[in-house]
Regions:
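Noncatalytic, typically N-terminal accessory segments of nucleic acid-processing enzymes
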Residues: 1-332
Length: 332
């Protein structure tokens, strides 16, 4: 990659796989019945590569192995500066000082944007190569704090394309007739977390497009989701607006999802698809706490060592094995 890319600097970044994480449930599902290895050494043929990579421990061993090999092959890279971020460290393959790139981010998603900010101090064009929608929206939401032109490269071979974040902002202005595209970009990040991502459940049958359209036609909702996650705590005013937003998402001008649930139930005489009703207010509060927490982590992407509060207070409960599970209602 480094030899084929026409770039002066390339940063390669990896996830960190922690034992107690809100991402563990998703990872455990991928790891069930998969291959586990004890050591990665050179000269071994890996026959079940997808099974190998489904296990977080395997990934970390492979990453460390690759980095150790890359360090011995730096001469073939030429003048390109290559930095590699893994665990809580970052190394430069050519021996440059990269202490200011040390960080404790768990996900490569946030680390990519953290590095983009660093790169923007010396380069006016930054290309983030990723297929992940989370990264695009984190970069879009924080683009106002990053100098230079931010581009997202996604897809491979003939399907590869480069997306300009500035063009997305201009499109938001035109399509939704809004003036402040930075505010709308921040709102899209907040809404993305609220409507579902790797760690947060989604609203069945609602997708992403309808929530975006609902938000963009009301400045109250744009401001709500632009501020969503600035602090990990959810205020009562925010939750009141969230209830109104969710009611509208389900086609009702109400302020309480419990009332909407009853209205739909009564209109259908009890015969209804569970997907057609919003969550009750108690469950919605727990969902909102989790989403606010996740968006807060994204917003902190530009900090090397962000202070993130305990997960337990924000809609998750920690079970005996240390994993986190979503709470559906407040503990009595």
């Amino acid at each position: 990659m480094a030899t084929s890319a026409k770039a002066s600097r390339i940063d390669i970044l990896f996830d960190v796989y922690r034992e107690n994480s809100i991402k563990n449930a998703e990872r455990v599902n991928r790891e069930l019945g998969k291959l586990e290895v004890k050591r990665v050494v050179g000269g071994q043929m890996i026959k079940q590569f997808s099974s190998l990579l489904s296990n977080g421990t395997n990934k970390m061993m492979l990453i460390r192995f690759l980095v150790s090999r890359w360090q011995t092959k730096y001469d073939c890279i030429g003048s390109t500066k290559v930095n590699v971020g893994f665990d809580e460290t970052c190394i430069s393959l050519n021996g440059s000082d990269v202490r200011d790139l040390q960080c404790n981010h768990e996900e490569a998603d946030t680390r990519l944007v953290f590095h983009a900010k660093h790169i923007s101090a010396t380069f006016d064009k930054i290309v983030i190569n990723t297929p992940d929608t989370d990264v695009l929206l984190i970069a879009l939401g924080l683009s106002g704090e990053i100098n230079g032109k931010l581009l997202i490269k996604t897809g491979v071979k003939n399907k590869a394309r480069i997306i300009s974040l500035e063009s997305i902002k201009e499109s938001l202005k035109t399509r939704y007739n809004i003036q402040d595209s930075d505010q709308a970009s921040k709102a899209l990040l907040g809404l993305h977390g609220f409507t579902g991502c790797d760690t947060i459940s989604s609203f069945a049958g609602k997708g992403k497009i309808k929530p975006v359209k609902t938000m963009m036609k009301d400045e109250v909702y744009i401001n709500l989701f632009a501020s969503f996650g600035l602090e990990p705590e959810l205020t009562e005013n925010q939750f009141a607006d969230i209830q109104k937003f969710v009611c509208e998402l389900y086609g009702h001008k109400e302020e309480d999802t419990n009332k909407v649930r009853y209205k739909i139930y009564a209109a259908k005489h009890g015969h209804l698809d569970p997907k057609s009703i919003p969550p009750c207010a108690d469950s919605l509060r727990q969902h909102s706490l989790r989403a606010c927490y996740q968006v807060h982590i994204w917003i902190k992407s530009l900090e090397s060592y962000p202070t993130i509060p305990s997960t337990v207070s924000f809609g998750w409960d920690q079970i005996e094995d240390g994993d986190f599970v979503s709470m559906l209602k407040m503990k009595s």
